[in-house]
Design a protein with these regions (language model features):
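Solvent-exposed coil/turn segments that connect beta secondary-structure elements
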Residues: 51-53, 62-66, 89-90, 174-176, ...
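Charge-rich, well-structured scaffold segments of protease-associated domains
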Residues: 39-42, 97-297, 363-524, 601-747, ...
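Mature N-terminal segment immediately following signal peptide/propeptide cleavage
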Residues: 28-62, 540-559
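Bacterial Sec-dependent signal peptides at the C-terminal "C-region" and cleavage site
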Residues: 16-31
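Active/ligand-binding-proximal structured segments within catalytic/core domains
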Residues: 52-101, 325, 335-348, 549, ...
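His/Glu-based metal-binding/catalytic segments typifying zinc-dependent metallopeptidases
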Residues: 206-212, 225, 295-353, 385, ...
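Bacterial N-terminal signal peptides
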Residues: 9-17
Length: 968
């Protein structure tokens, strides 16, 4: 105890010294986050904001460097290095760095030679040598040790991203693990070692493959290329070219790391439950002697020439047609232009009352049109994006967008939109500040752009100062009718995509039972445990009746003045597949008192919004916004549902758009895979039951659709309230605005069952692409048993739990088979539901056989590791200690437990049981619940590129049509 006291006292003295010795500190009066910003002597920025809603801290480490800083001959480097930052250092990720280093040096040398070879046979032979040395190096390496470290301390959301301007590393950690986090991050950033290079290269290439099937990504790359002839925003992409990705340079990567990964180019951003003084002391202790780079190169580029005539480009692909227009703007460092641009884009399109919203979307002139400003530090973009109706040309959509943009310069908009826009921005910021991730992201954005916090945190004041004249002048200067780029995304084959075969890779050693002394030191470090706080439904929320047949779930919002009212009805697509079309129709209609445009404009003025949602088993009507205005907003929505005036012209146009949307969905790889997954899990009867046939859709009348919505109000339902009013006030307010029948008909919940899989079979759906999507599913009919929950959750954590799980290690790290892969034992969502097991992977077509074989191997013969198990268990327990249910999330959690027949959540019992479980329990789950299953394998891909004879070895193969899986 005495030693603990001494250590604490020393820590506080160090913290105080850190505060007083810091010569560059910043606080801003009136900052709603009460932020503290410090610059250490080595240039490292530390941004902090305290939020004690849960005992966790969102951390971002932001590097002011991204794709724009890539060498021209090795584009994609910044993003690739982001991946390599997860491979460890000299202290972790290896069992013997001294023995490993000569092999890593040889791999580096071989890759430098490899990238100069053009002869295919010589390249193949060189890659065999690289693979051989890499395998030897893998015997010493300890893959995924970083992820083990983060899992061990209870981190969530371990990840990173790279854009043109930034590379950001994210962890959400328990509050008591800040020092361990700092120790690991300091070592990782200061002493990175590049290992696991060739298998990670395959993962990066799979990510590139996925981007090549995204026509939206290709469209935006073309926009940037048109706008920026000199700046890297337009001359190179974050993911790089296919050719350069296959010819990487470890030398260039190391040079990049040494140049940009330095303290005077990095910010640590923290938001959560912590003591800023202690946090700063830790940062200074572990990062303070990190040497800066006084010679960080400034990005050099020639200023862009003015665009004097529209630049037109075409891109091709299988997805639905669209057209985008973009104008070049000053970068986000120009605070005035950025503020006016944000307001101007909201006047043009805000989802409710903007010019495009009312003049284009509400009038059904196109399928859909959007506008937004895309801010970047060096140059920003003002963008419109439009999808054509059936029979409409992209040029016609372009002209409609130009007409709306021209209204900004002409001042052809109501000045009241400016005040409404600022109020809605204030509401959006209020919501942002509820969440640690959003709070810390505000720091990241300011740091990357080089905007002082005193300016960044006053952005709403700048928005409020924008006048109509400012918007007009902005549009006249930047949004002229001749200085834009237009990209037409047309249907057709993209001939620029190169088909590259996957190299032969020897699976590297995973060394699960090895651990570094560094990891052991972190594991042995004692921290004061955070006491768990499990939900108590009798105290944490209030459940009662609003009226006969109408239940109320209430939770008070103590954070801000936002209120949300949600009406939930146990009727969804299973009971009536036309319900979602009825909700879609309603949004175009008005009442005898207000037109549709007036409703949208009034809701925007109130800083409120409403939404309708229809899933398999329920329909939701939600109203949310500033608490004082929610009663009026709820009244408007209720009057609309009960008194909507039909319009047959609108309905006819809606039907045409729905048919077009169906055709477009069949062109989307993601939509096709979603449909195939539903078909695999639920079967053809489910598809038929939840999908209107074309004939049924055509025959729908206004009276049918609006009648379905009015009927909902005659049914029993549940009302969720989360807001600042007391329960008594909320009850009175809702009762006054909400229509409730005298004797509402009760509606029982009905759920979509999953199909049992007594024998294995293969379902193949066609989609022409360089990669396949794969989903295997098994249901043996086992019913929900709450006694199994703790063991199943621990199995899922060990086997499929993120980057530390067996799946990630085997499928991505060891074999380079995919960018993403997952597998888990699915627990039922209602008490009579059944367990299922699924596995998912996406990869290039020539990796199909290896992917399926290796998945089946690890599923049926699960690798066993006491070390990996201990880390999985420790991480799961740590996350449960810091798990908190707040706001609407608590009400949803209560409803989920109720569906499972639970009066109280299982969390406490699961937490207690987990502490006594061993690897033997996980092995027992695998043996009893997972091994030896029969599956339905669903594969979306090009049959001409798939190994069909191999698939027939898995079971009978049935080739489906897109009509089969979509139901139309």
């Amino acid at each position: 105890m005495k030693n603990l006291f001494i250590k604490t006292a020393v820590a506080l003295l160090v913290a105080a010294a850190a505060f007083t010795s810091c010569d560059r500190c910043e606080r801003v009066k009136g900052d709603p986050m009460k932020s503290l910003i410090y610059t250490l002597d080595n240039g490292l920025k530390v941004y902090m904001t305290v939020n004690k809603e849960e005992p966790r801290i969102q951390t971002y480490i932001a590097v002011r460097s991204g794709g724009k800083n890539d060498p021209h001959e090795t584009t994609g480097l910044a993003h690739y290095f982001e991946h390599l930052m997860f491979k460890g250092s000299e202290q972790f990720g290896t069992s013997d760095y001294a023995a490993e280093k000569p092999l890593l040096d040889e791999i580096e040398r071989l890759f430098e030679e490899y990238r100069t070879i053009t002869d295919p046979a010589e390249r193949l032979e060189m890659y065999r040598r690289i693979d051989s040395v890499s395998y030897e190096a893998s015997k010493i390496a300890i893959p995924n040790e970083y992820d083990k470290l983060m899992g061990m301390i209870g981190a969530r959301g371990t990840n990173a991203w790279t854009s043109q301007d930034e590379t950001v590393y994210t962890e959400d950690i328990p509050s008591n693990q800040l020092e361990n986090w700092a120790i690991v991050q300091a070592d990782r950033f200061r002493h990175n070692v590049i290992r696991g290079f060739h298998t990670e290269l395959e993962a990066v290439y799979e990510e590139k493959n996925m981007s090549l099937t995204s026509d939206t990504e290709k469209l935006f790359e073309a926009l940037q290329a048109g706008l920026f002839k000199n700046h890297p925003y337009g001359t190179q992409t974050v993911l790089g070219t296919q050719e350069q990705l296959k010819n990487p340079s470890i030398v260039n990567i190391k040079n990049y790391y040494n140049t940009f990964y330095v303290p005077n180019n990095i910010a640590i951003c923290l938001s959560g439950d912590f003591n800023p003084r202690e946090a700063l002391a830790l940062v200074k202790k572990y990062f303070g002697d990190w040497a800066p780079n006084p010679d960080i190169p400034t990005l050099k580029y020639e200023a862009e020439e003015p665009i004097t005539t529209p630049i037109e480009k075409d891109v091709y692909g299988l997805e639905a047609e669209m057209v985008a227009l973009a104008w070049r703007l000053p970068g986000s460092r120009d605070l005035k232009a950025t503020s006016v641009g944000e307001v101007a884009s909201s006047v043009l399109c805000n989802g409710r009352a903007g010019l495009i919203d009312l003049d284009i979307n509400m009038q059904q002139k196109v399928m859909q049109m959007y506008a937004f400003d895309n801010t970047q530090p060096d140059y920003s973009m003002f963008v419109t994006l439009g999808m054509p109706k059936q029979g409409q040309t992209l040029e016609q959509v372009r002209d409609l967008a130009l007409e709306e943009v021209a209204k900004l310069a002409a001042g052809d908009f109501d000045e009241s939109l400016l005040e409404s826009t600022v109020n809605n921005i204030r509401l959006r910021r209020m919501r942002q500040l509820e969440n640690n991730s959003n709070r810390a992201r505000l720091f990241v954005e300011a740091f990357i752009a080089g905007i002082p916090w005193k300016d960044a945190c006053k952005d709403i004041d700048r928005y409020a100062s924008v006048t109509k004249e400012d918007v007009m002048a902005f549009a006249q200067e930047y949004l002229r009718p001749e200085n834009f780029v237009v990209v037409y995304k047309r249907m057709g084959e993209d001939t620029s995509i190169e088909k590259i075969s996957a190299p032969a890779i020897t699976p590297i050693e995973t060394n699960r039972d090895k651990s570094s002394a560094f990891l052991q030191s972190i594991q042995d470090k004692e921290v004061k445990p955070i006491e768990p706080s499990f939900p108590d439904f009798s105290k944490d929320l209030s459940a009662g009746q609003l009226a006969q047949g109408v239940n109320l779930l209430y939770k008070k919002n103590t954070l801000n003045e936002i209120a949300t009212v949600e009406l939930l009805y146990n009727r969804g697509k299973l009971q009536d597949p036309a319900l979602e079309d009825a909700f879609a129709y309603l949004q175009y209609l008005g009442t005898s008192e207000m037109s549709a445009a007036e409703i949208s404009a009034r809701m925007y003025e109130l800083a409120c919004y409403f939404s309708f949602d229809c899933d398999d088993n329920s329909s939701s009507i939600m109203v949310s916004g500033l608490s004082d205005n929610v009663p009026e907003a709820l009244g408007i929505v209720e009057k609309l549902i009960l008194g909507a005036e039909p319009d047959e012209g609108i309905l006819a146009a809606l039907k045409a758009d729905l048919f077009k949307a169906r055709d477009d969905a069949k062109k989307s790889q993601d939509a096709c895979f979603d449909a195939l997954t539903d078909y695999v899990m639920h079967g053809p009867e489910y598809v038929k039951r939840t999908t209107l046939s074309s004939a049924d859709l055509s025959s729908l009348s206004s009276e049918q659709l609006l009648g379905k919505l009015r009927e909902l109000f005659e049914k029993g339902h549940e009302v969720l309230y989360y807001g600042p009013l007391s329960k008594e006030e909320a009850t009175k307010t809702i009762a006054a605005a909400h229509h409730m029948a005298d004797n509402p008909e009760p509606l029982a919940e009905e759920f979509a069952p999953t199909v049992q899989t007594p024998s294995s079979k293969v379902l193949v759906a066609p989609y022409t692409a360089a990669n396949f999507y794969y989903y295997q599913f098994s249901n043996r009919g086992e019913k929900y048993d709450p006694a199994q929950t703790a063991r199943i959750r621990l199995y899922n954590e060990y086997f499929g739990g993120g980057m530390n799980g067996i799946v990630f290690q085997e499928m991505r790290e060891a074999r380079g088979l995919a960018y993403s892969a997952s597998a888990r034992l699915r627990e039922p969502s209602w008490k009579d539901g059944e367990y299922g097991f699924y596995a998912y992977i996406a990869s290039q077509n020539d990796k199909l056989v290896k992917a399926v074989e290796n998945f089946d191997d690890i599923i049926n013969d699960m690798p066993e590791s006491e070390r990996a198990f201990d880390i999985a268990k420790q991480g799961l327990l740590s996350r449960m200690r810091t798990q908190r249910y707040r706001g609407l999330r608590l009400l949803d959690y209560y409803r989920n437990c109720r569906r499972l027949g639970l009066d109280e959540p299982l969390d406490k019992a699961v937490f207690e049981e987990l502490q006594g479980l061993t690897l033997e329990d996980v092995k027992a789950i695998q043996k009893q619940w997972v091994a030896g299953r029969t599956y339905t394998y669903g594969i979306l891909g090009d049959p001409a590129d798939l190994d069909m004879p191999y698939l027939r070895m898995l079971g009978p193969v049935k080739t489906l049509t897109l009509e089969d899986i979509f139901g139309y």
